[in-house]
Amino acid sequence: MDIQLSGIGMTSARTRDRLVQRLRDAGIQDERVLDAIRNTPRHLFIEEALAHQAYDDTALPIGHGQTISQPWVVARMTELLIAKGKPRKVLEIGTGCGYQTAVLAPFCDELYSVERIRPLQDLARKRLLQLGLAKVQLKHADGGFGWTAEAPFDAILAACARVDIPEGLLSQLADGGRLVMPVGGDRQQVLTVVDRDGDQFRSQTLDSVRFVPFQRGVLR
């Protein structure tokens, strides 16, 4: 995906370049990920009233008690997910507004994304189609169950926090695959990476983060 935007203010190349430099200074090293952040128009994924903050490195509300993750978190999770090589098939839990989905799309052949809140999924679908990302498969469902019909996945990214990792997601991770998600309660969460080797799962905890909680059921 290469979306060229021009102009001044919130959508200018200079504004987006400043964000990329902040992410680089904050430790994001993969230039492919930085390019994806630069080329993904974040202002399209938030309310117009907040558009002046679109390229700040901060989380923003998107309604229904949910947020669009700060760009550093999106970049970091993407960087971790592709560190072992390009995954062919990826599952995302928590489509939200679709921003993380759009950043992920260039790095895999097949992308499946589950969202439990119907209005958010509908908006994400429109935005992704607007960006030419028709290949992304979206599903309105409880993310705790993953997407059994399309499993296994080479990589799984969850954009919501739980105190543990759902067994349903681990079982859908392919041998040699990687899962990235925040783990913890309301007060403390850490970005966690799980690598599968046969029936063994090796995990490592990395950065402190703050995500909305993993919730069950669906909302229409």
Swiss-Prot record:
Pfam families: PCMT
Coiled-coil positions: none
PROSITE patterns: PCMT
Enzyme superclass (EC): transferase
Major subcellular site: cytoplasm
Catalytic residue list: S69
Assigned EC number: 2.1.1.77
Keyword Methyltransferase: yes
Localization of this protein: Cytoplasm
Keyword terms: Cytoplasm, Methyltransferase, S-adenosyl-L-methionine, Transferase
GO process terms (BP): methylation; protein modification process; protein repair
GO molecular function: protein-L-isoaspartate (D-aspartate) O-methyltransferase activity
Gene Ontology CC: one annotated term: cytoplasm
Claim: Transport is one of the keywords in the record: no
UniProt xrefs under CDD domains: AdoMet_MTases
Reactions that this protein is recorded to catalyse: [protein]-L-isoaspartate + S-adenosyl-L-methionine = [protein]-L-isoaspartate alpha-methyl ester + S-adenosyl-L-homocysteine
Family, similarity comment: Belongs to the methyltransferase superfamily. L-isoaspartyl/D-aspartyl protein methyltransferase family.
Cited function: Catalyzes the methyl esterification of L-isoaspartyl residues in peptides and proteins that result from spontaneous decomposition of normal L-aspartyl and L-asparaginyl residues. It plays a role in the repair and/or degradation of damaged proteins.
Designated name of the protein: Protein-L-isoaspartate O-methyltransferase
Organism: Alcanivorax borkumensis (strain ATCC 700651 / DSM 11573 / NCIMB 13689 / SK2)
Source organism phylogeny: Bacteria, Pseudomonadati, Pseudomonadota, Gammaproteobacteria, Oceanospirillales
